[in-house]
Amino acid sequence: LQRYLRRWSYSNADWDELIKLLESTMGQDLQAWNEIWIKESGAPVIEFQKNGIVMTDESGKNRVWPQAVSVFWDYMGLKRTLIPLRDSLTPFRYGAAVVLPDGDVMGYGCFLPTDFSIRFLDDELGNLNDPLYRAVAWQALYEGVLHKKVKGEFFLKLCIKHLPQEKNNLVVNRTLSFLRIIYSTYLDEGSRQLIQDDLERFCINM
């Protein structure tokens, strides 16, 4: 950055000039990164499957967003692994046991929950010690509703089950915003009526 400022201290330079300077300093080709991360819009959908981590470009352009993600998975205890994603499929033998797909919020994209993580969070969401992890869990479940991997009714039942014990106001407020969107947009009238009484008691207790 100092070289960049010295070189163009009295003239105009664009972003590409900075990228070229970084390339010469780092000895790496940054053009692909520059195109995907800076010049183009969009974000990947990232799913964890038995054979690994699948990155999908919903625009159909088959783009890949190189990045590293912090994955929490459960095999004889909760474990954390930092995984570099460099292709549309990244092998990961514990993909089906993932609990939090982007636990430290290092990644970029839509991270969908697995069937295992949905069952795990149903039981253990409130027991996650770090409020960041609980926030990540709610975000993943919300994304699951948007992508039809989690039923809206199930999300609301999780809110009724776990949110009354939540002490972090940021987690509560953000999750309640998810609840409002799901209730008004992703539930039909019959589903709303079925959960209405439980939801009213929940709102009173909150």
Regions found by a protein language model. Name each.
Residues Q2-M206:
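Non-catalytic accessory/interaction domains
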